Amino acid sequence: MIAPTMRRSDLHAEPEALHPSLWRASQLARAGARCIDTGHPALSAQLPGGGWPTGTLVDLMLQQPGIGEMRLLRPALAAVASRRIVLLQPPHPPQALALAALGVQPSQLIWLRAGTTADVLWAAEQVLKSGSCGALLCWQQQVRPESLRRLHLAAQGGDTLFFMLRPLAAGHDTSPAPLRLALRPQAGGIGIEFVKRRGPLREAPLFLPLVSYLHHHRHAPVDRPASAPVAARGLQSQLVH
């Protein structure tokens, strides 16, 4: 069978008009799904669709936990806080003060802990497949590429904000995530390196100033754990509430 000849008009069409996975290398791609505003105009201007993509894997590689990643995500989490927000295997228990600063009510939070990597990945997949959560933040040291692909596929079936938070070294590993950012602490804010995005290469890191939680909550109560963790294998009952 002879392949159909490409029409002359196709040569001048926007790449996205030919296939949604295509874009010009000199331009940011159009968003293939709904995006959530980052709340940081300088960052949004550098992302396809002008925000965090939903229904897909987003890789955040951290120099170390606690460098400002939660403050970076605060506006987006507040935007989806009408639905459950899942913290899976966070390095520290979530604190009431931090949740208040994020605009998240403790009743909307599910804090999950798992004993093994397999349980972490299983729980993440169940959250994504349920379609009932506004955001999933999953902390993990090492994840095999095939496991990332499985989670990415599960994410595409819904509109959950899905962030995988891993060490900087993970930036050298392959990942199906269309957006990968490396985060490093800087005085007064955070430095963001665009490891991968659907658009032109950006070599210079982006600096974002971040305001401390305590700046907004000077009279907040003393930090305390927001709730007890849920075992990963006991997740199903939490998702149907």
Protein language model features and the residues they cover:
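Detector for small/aliphatic-rich hydrophobic stretches
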Residues: 1-87, 101, 106, 197-200, ...
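Conserved RecA-like P-loop NTPase ATPase core
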Residues: 43, 60, 109, 136, ...
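A short acidic, amphipathic alpha-helical/loop segment
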Residues: 72-76, 98, 123, 147-151, ...
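Glycine-biased, small-residue-rich flexible motifs in mid-sequence functional cores and linkers
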Residues: 83-86, 96-97, 102, 118, ...
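Long, charge-dense
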Residues: 84-143
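A contiguous pocket-lining binding segment that forms or flanks enzyme active sites
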Residues: 128-172, 177
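Phosphate-binding/switch region of NTP-binding enzymes
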Residues: 166-233
